[in-house]
């Protein structure tokens, strides 16, 4: 009904159950949201003649993780050890199946996008490193981390968002050339271990302290990197901020929020720093 009323030209699908450890506790919900949510959306697209382009945003964790040092490319195999990762791989497979079976022949162009570990102000989710760090800092508590040597491709939230919008525009104007999977990750130097992130944040916030959780943990990937060469070459998309800048902006946003600042005035300069790309 919402699709019929809105009659959109372009659809961006970002809704998800986004947490790995939560997926162990609630696997049925995770698959229902991440897999059947994609199916339901694409069925709605099929029944909405106005739609010409669709972008399904999944995750870097959709790849079959081989725990190697090389960044994953878009043509690597889908996989996933845990319910969250595998549900996103399923969403990718559903996307490809609907493209081949229904949407391409109907003139609807669909692509998928895979970003890294996105950070930035306003993320209040539980079980995420930087929100957990900020909550512990504000409460004067010790930060407990579970996987200090796990490496992730960290990036500021505006970076992949620009990639998504650029890709959606090209899908709408040049459809078939861009109807495929795309990575939007940071430069390889910004793929760092959790311990590096925590130590950097603590160097900027001397009152912060942390320790490792000694309890057994559920399985999570140890090494994860993305190769975004295709987006750089074909879309002209490149990361603009390194990891230190991204972390600094995230801390500044949070401190401004604590002071009661008008957050649009805080966030808009961050957007302008990425100009002319956004």
Question: Residue ranges of each PLM-predicted region?
Answer:
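NAD(P)H-binding glycine-rich loop region in Rossmannoid oxidoreductase-like domains
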Residues: 1-32
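Catalytic helix-loop patch of NAD(P)-dependent Rossmann-fold dehydrogenases
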Residues: 25-43, 47, 52-53, 57, ...
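Glycine-rich "substrate-gating" loop/helix at the edge of Rossmann-like oxidoreductase active sites
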Residues: 81-84, 115-127, 147-159, 186-190
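Alpha-helical substrate-binding/gating segment
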Residues: 104, 131-143, 154-182, 199
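Conserved C-terminal active-site "lid" loop/helix of NAD(P)H-dependent oxidoreductases
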Residues: 157, 164, 180-181, 216-238, ...
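Non-catalytic, hydrophobic alpha-helical segments
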Residues: 160, 164, 184, 194-197, ...
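C-terminal "lid/loop" region of Rossmann-like NAD(P)-dependent oxidoreductases
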Residues: 179-183, 192-198, 203-223, 265-272
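Amphipathic terminal alpha-helices
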Residues: 243-278
């Amino acid at each position: 009904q919402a699709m019929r009323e809105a009659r959109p030209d372009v659809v961006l699908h970002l809704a998800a159950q986004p947490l790995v450890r939560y997926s162990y506790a609630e696997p049925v919900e995770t698959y229902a949201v991440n897999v059947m949510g994609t199916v339901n959306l694409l069925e709605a697209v099929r029944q909405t003649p106005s739609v010409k382009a669709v972008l399904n945003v999944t995750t870097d964790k959709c790849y079959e993780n081989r725990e190697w040092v090389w960044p994953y490319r878009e043509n690597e195999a889908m996989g996933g050890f845990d319910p969250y990762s595998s549900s996103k791989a399923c969403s990718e497979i559903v996307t490809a199946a609907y493209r081949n079976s229904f949407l391409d022949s109907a003139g609807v162009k669909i692509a998928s996008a895979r970003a890294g570990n996105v950070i930035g102000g306003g993320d209040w989710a539980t079980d995420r490193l930087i929100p957990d760090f900020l909550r512990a800092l504000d409460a004067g508590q010790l930060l407990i981390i579970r996987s200090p040597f796990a490496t992730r491709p960290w990036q500021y939230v505006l970076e992949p968002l620009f990639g998504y919008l650029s890709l959606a525009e090209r899908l709408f104007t040049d459809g078939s050339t861009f109807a495929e999977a795309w990575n939007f990750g940071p430069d390889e130097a910004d793929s760092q271990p959790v311990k590096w992130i925590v130590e950097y944040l603590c160097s900027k916030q001397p009152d912060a302290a942390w320790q490792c959780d000694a309890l057994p943990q559920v399985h999570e990937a140890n090494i994860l990197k993305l190769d975004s060469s295709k987006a750089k070459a074909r879309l002209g998309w490149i990361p603009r901020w390194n990891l230190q800048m991204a972390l600094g902006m995230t801390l500044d946003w949070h401190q401004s929020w604590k002071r009661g600042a008008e957050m649009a005035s805080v966030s808009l300069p961050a957007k302008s720093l990425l100009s002319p790309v956004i």
